Structure formats: structure tokens, C-alpha cells
Amino acid sequence: MDHEQTRKELAAAFRWAARLEYHEGVANHFSAAVSDDGQDFLINTRGMHFSRAQASRLALVTSSDRASDPVAENVDATAWILHSYIHRNVPRARCILHTHMPYTTALASLKNFEFLMLDQNACRFYDRIAYDRHYAGMALDPSEGERVASLLTDGKDILFLANHGVLVVADTIAQAFDELYYLEKAAQLQVIALSTGRELQLVDNETAALACKQWREYPEAAELHLAALMDILDIELADYIK
């Protein structure tokens, strides 16, 4: 199987992450599982700029046997460790997006910060964020992948990585990118609101929980969002599907 549609959607996610300035150099990594057990997944190759992502250029790797898989050797080491462990150990993580996008990373770098229920977008993430509060350097040891995967429990789909960035997991590419987009929007608003020094008017927990449920049940919102983004690319940068 060539997983054509998955490749196209993931390439579109890369292109839009670049357009929205979520990327950082040729670092950061997105992946999408293509096997039921999560051991086979598509991921960006080492050194690929997000703005140049193409469906055919994404690496198909098998996490059960890296040493004998030459394709896997062209994948960033930290990407390999994080994504392989999460795909294998978190069944709902069919798509994993990891970025150092500025506003979310800024909040993740505040001591003991908890994401504020400040607006409708923030309420989408009510009780869904996990926090890794200790930065221990780059994820170059397999134990780090195992540790990070263990934090994505109890329905937590977003992981704030202290002094580092954020990781989003979802069942589909459309859902994951929609989460990433609205997370950064909500984080941007929080940074702006905090910068005023004024008292914040927060949404109460009951209302935040209701809004979160409404977000989750809103019909086809994520799919429509990705389809619209792909339509734009089809007109302006159609080479992403090659």
C-alpha cells in the first residue's frame, strides 16, 4: 500500500505549519501511523524543510526494526525515539505533531504554568493537557521516548514540554492539525492578555467542560478545516501532492 491520502494530508500539514510559522529550521516532526499496531508510520526525513514537504518524500518506517531499515536511518534521532514509542504505546495517537511554535512554547516555559481557560478556544483543551515540567535535554535515549509516552494517559492529548515545545496526538491528521492550530491561537491570546498585567476573567470549570464537549462533538469541523487548507494548496502550491 502507498497510503496516498495519508501522505497528501500529512504533506499538507507540513506546508501549513510552515506558512503559520509553527516550524523551526529543519527541526520538529510530524508523523502518521499506517499500521494497526502503530509500528509502521510516515514521518518527515532528516533535513526536510516543512515548506518543501511532498507526499512522496515522506519516509515510511517500521519502528520494530530500525537497525535493518535504511530508510529509518534518514529520520532525525529525536523524532524516531519520540514518535516510535508514542505510536506503539498510545493507541489513539494515530497522528503525532511536535513543534516549538512560539506562543505555546512560551507558556510551556513559565514555571508551574497551567493553561488558562481564558477564551472559547482554550476551553477546547479543558482537562486534556498533560505537563512534562522537567527539561532534561534532547530525547536521544529510548527511555525518554518511553517516559514521554507514559504521560499521555487519562485522555490527555496535548503535552506541554517544559522549556521545549508541545506535542499533540489525535486519531487523524485533520484532528491533530486542528488541535495544533487552535492551541496556538489560544496560547497567543493568553500571552497577550498576561502582558497587560490586568486581572483575567477566566471561564469557570463547568462552562469550560461544556465548551470542550461541544468542541469535540462539532460535526466534521477538523475535516472541513483540513479540506479547506488543502484546497488552497491545490491552487497555490500543488506540488505538495507529488
Model-derived features: where do they sit?
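Glycine-rich flexible loops
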Residues: 1-242
